[in-house]
Amino acid sequence: MTDIINKLQAFADANPQSIAVRHTTDELTYQQLMDESSKLAHRLQGSKKPMILFGHMSPYMIVGMIGAIKAGCGYVPVDTSIPEDRIKMIINKVQPEFVFNTTDESFESLEGEVFTIEDIKTSQDPVIFDSQIKDNDTVYTIFTSGSTGEPKGVQIEYASLVQFTEWMLELNKSGNKQQWLNQAPFSFDLSVMAIYPCLASGGTLNLVDKNMINKPKLLNEMLTATPINIWVSTPSFMEMCLLLPTLNEEQYGSLNEFFFCGEILPHRAAKALVSRFPSATIYNTYGPTEATVAVTSIQITQEILDQYPTLPVGVERLGARLSTTDDGELVIEGQSVSLGYLKNDQKTAEVFNFDDGIRTYHTGDKAKFENGQWFIQGRIDFQIKLNGYRMELEEIETQLRQSEFVKEAIVVPVYKNDKVIHLIGAIVPTTEVTDNAEMTKNIKNDLKSRLPEYMIPRKFEWMEQLPLTSNGKIDRKKIAEVING
């Protein structure tokens, strides 16, 4: 596959009435997707700046993506869940010529001409448009959090997206014309893992509404109505869905492939999923936004579960060469690496290198290569110092999750005068806690055999489930706010 747009157009010509995108009762056929995106591309033609794509899970968000790719300008997805001040920061950074608003509400942009769905539906522009995008053009820019509070716009080139899509289709064992589930909002690059492999293989992209993120029963209704074949989500979202006893192979026999990315996949969660879907293909993948979604993969089997108490993220893919610094920081090199941060030379220079035409990115993740597999050991910036000891919070969390009394765990440092004074564990227990002191004692006894005393949390807070962000990741900030009152 050398071009995604040509692939989509060929499928639309052969299967015009096949459903390309579905969100609740809203659907678009492949013919509609290609026609509407061409009409949008005519309006964007000649623009040298990325289009702001505003909305949530409307099928017209996909129209916006394909239209912006055809026009060659690329797009910046902005989800409705993003705070207004952050949206203003993004628009100020992008300085767009055009904004495509896919919501029913008005969108006040300080920059750029605003289009609506109705504008495109009623447009008399031609439904044929020859794609203008080139391999080295920026296809999308996704903004991630910055340490200073200013979001950073990660620019991904078209050739990187095409290469990633080809890799995903090589991993995919379910074949073409499958029903794909996408959990992630489009401002989160995990969505790319579902969108382009799905459409490039003639599948139907089923979009999970934001109301389903913390309500698995609503998702159950969706899965009952639509027999999904391929599931793409964060591990945290899948864990929440496993609260449904009906989420199993007997109930959902069509669901035969899972892709996870965006977070570390806990061993306990993977074990539960393998037990419930013994015939399914389950992939654990890893990659930062700055390296086109994912750069490693491993198929999780019972053999892998038995061999590794902490799951590896697998082996590198084409377009990504992995290595570590003397400090254990993971470095990614190759085609998968981003073009840098939009209009932010200082931050780009801190973590990217483009010498001799080779792109490298310092991830900030601690990693090791062992037994032919890569392992992610947490964030370097999740290191803290307590009583003179430097430690990794994620190492403590990993050990907590191996306790028979713990289903899920997050460790929160408690500060006083900018200094960590002790640790608290936010715990989802495997059983109801009837005796707080007894449960605390049991968990601490488990930890004492695996961690030094200074790394064991002083106390534990019990939670029914860990809160998730709009991206479906564990919301560490909210947990810290709850614990610290």
Swiss-Prot record:
Binding-site list for D-alanine: D189, V293, K473
Localization terms from the record: Cytoplasm
CDD domains referenced in this protein's UniProt entry, alphabetically: DltA
EC number from the UniProt entry: 6.2.1.54
InterPro entries to which the protein is assigned, alphabetical: AA_adenyl_dom, AMP-bd_C, AMP-bd_C_sf, AMP-dep_synth/lig_dom, ANL_N_sf, DltA, DltA-like
Record GO biological process: lipoteichoic acid biosynthetic process
Principal subcellular localization: cytoplasm
Signal peptide extent: none
EC class (word): ligase
Keyword hit for Protein transport: no
Gene3D superfamilies reported in the protein's UniProt record: 3.30.300.30, N-terminal domain of ligase-like (3.40.50.12780)
Function: Catalyzes the first step in the D-alanylation of lipoteichoic acid (LTA), the activation of D-alanine and its transfer onto the D-alanyl carrier protein (Dcp) DltC. In an ATP-dependent two-step reaction, forms a high energy D-alanyl-AMP intermediate, followed by transfer of the D-alanyl residue as a thiol ester to the phosphopantheinyl prosthetic group of the Dcp. D-alanylation of LTA plays an important role in modulating the properties of the cell wall in Gram-positive bacteria, influencing the net charge of the cell wall.
Name this polypeptide is given: D-alanine--D-alanyl carrier protein ligase
Annotated source species: Staphylococcus aureus (strain Mu50 / ATCC 700699)
Encoding gene (name): dltA
